[in-house]
Every structure is written in C-alpha cells, then in structure tokens.
Amino acid sequence: MKRDYFSHASKDAYRQPLDQQSGSCIALIDARFLVWLAQHNQAGPKKDALNRFDLAQFLIGALGHAGLDVSIKRIYWYAEENEVLDVDGQIVRKVLSHDSDGGISLLKTLGQDLSRLAQSKACDHVLLATDDERFLTAIDDAQLTGLQIHILADDAASNMQQLHQSDPGWGRLLSQADRRVVVQAKSLAEMLQGSASKEAPQVQEDPEVIR
C-alpha cells in the first residue's frame, strides 16, 4: 500500500522559499556587468552616463523580492571608466578594462574586498554583481566563514536547469549563491538612465525652520 506521508498543505509549505532574512548588506558591483544586465535584450544606458543616486534603493527593492529584508551599508562600484559622480555610501574602485587584461584587475580587486569583508565580519550579507565564474573559489571561501553571498541575475535564473545547458559557467556561478536576486532589465535601465546630476539632490529648506 502506498503511503502519503505528507499532506497537500505540508507539500506546498515544503516548496516555499526560505524564510525572510534580515541584517546588513554590502554590495560589490561590477559596473561593466550591470550595464550588460541593463542592456539585456534591449537598448540600455551608456557606461559614461550612469545615474547611481538611486542604485541603493533599487538594490534594496530587489533584495526584498528575494526574501531579504536587509539594509545596504555601502556599495563598492568597480568601474573601468573615470567616474564623475560622488554618491554618499558608494566607494568607486578603478579597475583596468576587461579588453586589456581579461578581467584580472577586477578579479583581484573585488576578490580581495570580498575576502576582507568575510574575515572582518563587517556585514551579514554581500550582494555580488558579476558573471565571472572565476569568483567561485572566493565566494565559497567567504561562505565558509558564515557570510551569505547573493548574486544579481536576469530572468534566466528563474530556470536554472535550462541555464546550466545554455550557459554552464553562468549557471555554476549562480548555483553557488545563497539567493539569486533577479532584476528586470527594463527597470534597471530606467534607473541607470535617470537624471545623473553631478551633485547630490538639493533639500528644500523649510521656511518655518528658517524663522
């Protein structure tokens, strides 16, 4: 006789994603990859005209959709171009162009930062935006310290079985993530194409306070 050890309710509960988690997060963002993600299947922003003022809020929203109620303490932005924007809470790291060194500069710089964050236990979560599977060892080492690593991804992450067949390297990298944080290319492009003022938004003075 075949026994059904699980009720339908418990089966459905078993299929649910992990419980929502909280804590602090630091984002390590490969600018080159983020632009590619925004341009995926559409015309996206140019590298030299990126608006990063709303990036933190955008990433917090994406993390929330992945079941992560976290605050972003800081963003590290790894860019090949000279950046003209100074954004609070964002540190720019200049790296060599991928065409000139095959991404070695990014691999070394971002990898060292990830290792230091893990060793110092500076945060509970790291959001990583890159598609370079050479980070697998660095990610695994960081996770062994208890740090949770989440990776920014496109819609392809919703079908991992197919992704492993179409892009094995990208699939292996995403499989290592504690959470895959999916963003829509259109929404990302719209955020990055926003008005990129070189100065922080001005706060309107309250006339009552002035008096």
Language-model regions, residue ranges each:
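Nuclease catalytic cores that cleave nucleic-acid phosphodiester bonds
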Residues: 82-211
